[in-house]
Amino acid sequence: MQVDELLKPFPIKEFHPFPRALLGPGAHEMIGPEALKLGFKKTLVMTSGLRGSDIVHKITESMKYHGLEVVLYDKVESNPKDYNVMDAVKLYQENKCDSFVSIGGGSSHDACKGARISVAHDGRNVNDFEGFNKSENPRNPPHIAVSTTAGTGSETSWAYVITDTTTDPDNPHKYVAFDDASVATLAIDDPVLYYSCPIDYTAQCGFDVLAHASEPYVSRLNFEPSLGNALRAIKLTAENLRQATWNPSELSGREGMMYAQYIAAQAFNSGGLGIIHSISHAVSAFYDTHHGLNNAIALPRVWAFNMPVAYKRFADMAEAMGVDTHGMTDVQAADALAAAIRLLRDVGIPEKFTDVTQDSYSKNRLGQGPTKFYEQASVIKGDDEDVDRITNHVLGDACTPGNAKECTFETVRPVVDHCMNGDLDDLLS
């Protein structure tokens, strides 16, 4: 669907594919045999490097044990940049690779998806493919996506997100490319790989899951096949995120979040997203903050904004989050907002963007080191100019047309301003 089509009613719904997947403890050990089945011979492995863990080393050594040649690109940054993608494409072409493996969270997977699309088009700039199904060659190199976080679900979706730093260097633009040709060939979700994920990152990724689940549940697309997965993912997140954050070495919480992220991604894959993601994209474009952190801060404000047009859906979400709604009207039962705020506070996430500093998220996941962009990250200002430019970015985001409530500059600007400067308790009064 094109963005202009999304602005109209949705008479025709579209179901988008997701890949074959291996899920569960130990699944990552299957990468060698699975790669051989898919015809891999010389593989470009794309990752952030996952500093502080030996995951990449173990997986690449396993691949070599099975006779595969490995070329490593480990400079993917958080909010992957167009130059990350194009540097990887150059490395792929120079080494005559025939396949891709991405190891990490959404940044590694998204950069890899963009690289695959570029390679299939003889190395064209990845920014040429912003939009909906802009690729012209449906055949691209095979790709195994190995997740080390429970967050984006990028390993199973048809979307990838890239930051365009070249079109207007003074105003970087983070965009979503939706492309059926970008879907991974095989997804591997193994909760054992999550053990090395820092606690703060675990919490923030969990709110990415909650955003992925809640937005399609109230989306204007109202896509019936997504609703069951969305509600189940909300329930799993409410039941498991505290455990995964407070007891990170305990398997049950990690495994619960693995399933939550996987089915939440299947929900939004066809059910759409909204301005939680639009706000997140805008803030990370200008400040390079972590996507999950941005979603966590935006989520309560956007829920409050959307609730008046979807009380019944929010009542369902409240029940899924453990609120006793027996005997209440839908308006009374729509207490999911309070449940979300309690969860955010329980797992220790900053409550507004002006509380965020460079110490608010794990730097070992931010591509520190040889980077062209990280130096631009700074403390968020949150002044009128900041709110205006972020609001304008939100209105141009591909996720905005699916939002439950219609969005204009006048209606969205107060939401953005509250994300920047507001007190969460104001939403409960």
From Swiss-Prot:
One of the Pfam families matching this protein, by short name: Fe-ADH
Reactions catalysed: methanol + A = formaldehyde + AH2
Keyword NADP found: yes
Keywords (A to Z) from UniProt: Magnesium, Methanol utilization, NADP, Oxidoreductase, Zinc
Thermal activity profile: The MNO activity increases with temperature up to 55 degrees Celsius.
GO annotation (BP), single: methanol oxidation
Role description: Catalyzes the oxidation of methanol to yield formaldehyde. While the in vivo electron acceptor is not known, N,N-dimethyl-4-nitrosoaniline (NDMA) can serve this function in vitro and is reduced to 4-(hydroxylamino)-N,N-dimethylaniline. It can also use various other primary alcohols, polyols and formaldehyde. In addition, MNO is able to produce methylformate from methanol plus formaldehyde, and possesses a formaldehyde dismutase and a NADH-dependent formaldehyde reductase activity.
pH dependence: Optimum pH is between 4.5 and 5.
Protein name (database record): Methanol:N,N-dimethyl-4-nitrosoaniline oxidoreductase
Family: Belongs to the iron-containing alcohol dehydrogenase family.
Gene3D superfamilies linked: 3.40.50.1970, Dehydroquinate synthase-like - alpha domain
CDD domains (UniProt xref): LPO (cd08176)
Keyword Magnesium recorded: yes
Induction: By methanol and ethanol.
Enzyme Commission number(s) from the entry: 1.1.99.37
Disruption phenotype: Cells lacking this gene are unable to grow methanol, ethanol, propan-1-ol and butan-1-ol, but are still able to grow on formaldehyde.
Signal peptide: none
Listed cofactors: Mg(2+); Zn(2+); NADPH
Native organism taxonomy: Bacteria, Bacillati, Actinomycetota, Actinomycetes, Pseudonocardiales
